[in-house]
Amino acid sequence: MLTIYLKQYNKIIRNAEPELLDNLGYDDIQWIDLLSPTIKEQKAVEAFMEESLQTRQQVEEIESTSKYSERENSIISNTNFFVPRGDSFSVEPVSFIISNEGVLVSLRNEESRTFREAEKRLQMNYRSFSTGYHIFISLLEVRIDFDADLVEFVAKQVATLSKDINTEDTIDKDVIHRINSLQENTMVLRENIFDRQRILSNILRSERFPNDIYPRLQLMIKDVNSLINHADFSFQRLDYIQDSALGLINIEQNEIVKIFSVAAVIFLPATLIASVYGMNFDVMPELSWTWCVGGYTIPLGYLFAIGLMILCSGLTIWFFRYKKWL
């Protein structure tokens, strides 16, 4: 979709025909927004700007020169915007081109709250957005505000996770999955905020932007630095939560091993006694012990062996309790 924002009377032309650009000049347009453009729309904008638009591969490159570069007739900047996907979010690359005449071109493939909010600001106070430079900075401002909301959202999720771990008796694999998911989201969020920090730093060093923009850039960089610190804190807290969760899992596993170990030790003396009296020797006097009472013969050897096994097991249990191992 091709959307054109005209300078005169803040007029917006949505779903514009590409041929419309043939009748317009740089003085007529502030902003050209391309949302999942057709080949015809893309070629029309390239012809109007006399500049090739960035491919998705170029936008996704991680080199610093691919994020911000100044050319003879234009400025090119590539960044990533977050797109909500249920409980998580994905990263969608966005490309910007600003001509020396102050015309902004944005290229994206996903609908974004950032652009809708920037459009509202443009319509409410279009006199404050005299050039595409101002619109570009406004887009970054809105994006930073939304990034702050995401950082706060992740921080709340981390706090909820920490509370759940402290109140639950057992830790299952779902908790570990939640920790890993939050770590991944926090890491991606921090990387993209850092990406915006680099873009703002490059703009601050540039001499092409209007002078009234630079004070705003100083405030934006401070906000970005604060967001990076908050994201770092959330990531460090997740590391602590992960260590705590793994520690609790180890304690649970040790308790299970302890039960089996204690059971084995308790029955070890009884097993030894049974093994001794189970040996097939000819001379084992205890086996022939008997006691005759009222015509009945009681096998004392058998009772002696059973009693000895019970006594040894009981003494072992008492010893463990005395040592507070049970």
Residue ranges of each PLM-predicted region?
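Peripheral, non-transmembrane regulatory/ligand-interaction domains of membrane transport proteins
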Residues: M1-P210, L219, D223-S226, G301, ...
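Hydrophobic alpha-helical segments, principally membrane-spanning helices and signal/leader peptides
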Residues: P18, Q57-Q58, G86, V175, ...
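Alpha-helical heptad-repeat coiled-coil segments that mediate oligomerization/polymerization in large
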Residues: E168, D172, I213, M220, ...
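DNA-binding recognition helix and immediately preceding turn/loop
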Residues: F209-R216, S234
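Hydrophobic alpha-helical transmembrane segments and their immediately adjacent juxtamembrane loops
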Residues: N225-L326
